[in-house]
Design a protein with these regions (language model features):
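Short, aromatic/basic amphipathic alpha-helical patches
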Residues: 23, 75, 138-141, 157
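Active-site rim beta-loop-alpha module in soluble metabolic enzymes
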Residues: 148-160
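Phosphate/diphosphate ligand-binding glycine-rich loop within oxidoreductases
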Residues: 2-113
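Glycine-rich adenosine-cofactor-binding loop
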Residues: 11, 98-103, 110-143, 147-149
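Hydrophobic beta-strand segments of well-ordered beta-sheets in folded domains
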Residues: 5-7, 59, 120-122, 143-145, ...
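Charged interaction patches that mediate protein-protein contacts
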Residues: 1-2, 149
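Short secondary-structure boundary/hinge segments and terminal tails
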Residues: 45, 128, 155-156
Length: 160
């Protein structure tokens, strides 16, 4: 796997993010040549696109609020059904891809400690994009969701 020309974080605010440092640590452990770390301050698709279109080469970005909730239609990517958020964007050879990794990461961590989603019930508090991503991934692996009230209600989705 080749490292991108750039990796970092996009959204607003992003200056506090440790994501570029984490990319460097993981990239170094994988033997990837270090990419240039970037912070892309953007609140929506148009502002984001205007800032990254001038960058040459491949690009890996973690997206935070509010950018992760943008429709990303100009880039041709969309989040998983019900999640409606993308927290990872990648441009490789000029083609954009997006993913919501919170849920798959949570399921992987649960499996690592011996907890299988299939047939298990997960109580989940709130309804933000991380909660929706986890609910979608958990239910797609055969688990059930019991929503708990948080700052936001967990909307209806593929986990119902």
């Amino acid at each position: 796997m080749d490292a991108p020309a750039y990796w970092g974080v996009a959204g607003r605010p992003v200056s506090h993010s440790i994501t570029p440092k984490l990319f460097s640590i993981v990239g170094g452990a994988m033997g990837l040549v270090q990419a240039e770390q970037i912070f892309v301050e953007a609140s929506g698709d148009e502002e984001f696109y205007s800032k990254v279109e001038m960058l040459e080469g491949d690009l890996w970005l973690s997206c935070t609020t509010p950018l992760k909730h943008s429709p990303h239609s100009k880039l041709g990517v969309k989040g998983p059904q019900g999640v409606n958020a993308i927290n990872q964007l990648m441009r490789s050879k000029g083609v954009w891809k997006g993913a919501s990794t919170d849920g798959t990461g949570f399921v992987s961590a649960c499996r690592h400690i011996g907890v299988e989603p299939s047939g298990s019930i997960l109580r989940i508090r709130g309804g933000g994009s991380t909660a929706r991503s986890i609910a979608a991934a958990w239910s797609s692996e055969g688990g059930s969701i019991i929503p708990e009230k948080g700052r936001r209600e967990l909307v209806r989705g593929p986990w119902d």
